[in-house]
């Protein structure tokens, strides 16, 4: 089976490096599926999920805060601010961040940075969705 190398990296560390048969991410204009021999491409990614299907058929879910996706003939590179594997998400901590962001947005005054609260809310929601997908997949 044909594969393409996939690298998911942040400024701090390499999050994933390996061979993939398919990489799915959400671009600004919708969902993208990148398979081997895909045409070169560069696009911005929305906060959301990235799913990497490895050469052995395993599906790896990542929650990302947004970023850039670049496709070259032999490699897909995803540059992100933050990314978390679904299995590494601490649900209680993420729920606390989400609730705090919702509270700040509901009671906003002059001191609340609305953009930052919305960013936190989006990031927490994406992480919780990735965790839920992981749980559903484990049940099957």
UniProtKB/Swiss-Prot annotation:
It is found in: Cell inner membrane. CDD domains: F1-ATPase_delta. Its main location: membrane. Gene3D superfamilies: ATP synthase delta/epsilon subunit, C-terminal domain, F0F1 ATP synthase delta/epsilon subunit, N-terminal. Pfam families: ATP-synt_DE, ATP-synt_DE_N. SUPFAM superfamilies: Epsilon subunit of F1F0-ATP synthase C-terminal domain (SSF46604), Epsilon subunit of F1F0-ATP synthase N-terminal domain (SSF51344). Keywords: ATP synthesis, Cell inner membrane, Cell membrane, CF(1), Hydrogen ion transport, Ion transport, Membrane, Transport. It is a peripheral membrane protein. GO terms for cellular component: plasma membrane; proton-transporting ATP synthase complex. GO terms for molecular function: ATP binding; proton-transporting ATP synthase activity, rotational mechanism. The keyword Magnesium does not apply. The keyword Transport applies. F-type ATPases have 2 components, CF(1) - the catalytic core - and CF(0) - the membrane proton channel. CF(1) has five subunits: alpha(3), beta(3), gamma(1), delta(1), epsilon(1). CF(0) has three main subunits: a, b and c. Produces ATP from ADP in the presence of a proton gradient across the membrane. HAMAP family: ATP_synth_epsil_bac (MF_00530). Belongs to the ATPase epsilon chain family. PANTHER family: ATP SYNTHASE DELTA/EPSILON CHAIN, ATP SYNTHASE EPSILON CHAIN, CHLOROPLASTIC. This is ATP synthase epsilon chain. It comes from Xanthomonas oryzae pv. oryzae (strain MAFF 311018).
